[in-house]
Design a protein with these regions (language model features):
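Ribonuclease/tRNase effector modules and their secretory precursors
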Residues: 1-80
Length: 80
């Protein structure tokens, strides 16, 4: 993964019109946790992808799953 991250990771989520109510936004902290190397998650059926932008205008795709307590686990972050 390219490394222009650390705290340049300020994401403005792109608004989606019909977002399911309980679906949480992926926060910058979630992403930072992943980039700082948490052990890889077990594969999960309900992965979701959120698109966002970094401040310098690159696109981001954040793939995440929801854990039990509504907590979000980010699986991968790509700048395609």
């Amino acid at each position: 993964m390219p490394a222009p991250y650390h705290d340049a990771m300020k994401i403005t989520p792109i608004r989606h019109a019909h977002r399911r109510m309980r679906e949480r936004r992926v926060s910058v902290a979630d992403i930072r946790n992943v980039l700082n190397g948490r052990p890889p998650m077990h594969p999960s059926p309900n992965k979701r992808v959120q698109m966002g932008r970094t401040l310098d205008g690159r696109r981001l795709e954040v793939m995440y799953t929801e854990a039990k307590a509504g907590e979000v686990r980010v699986v991968s972050v790509v700048t395609p």
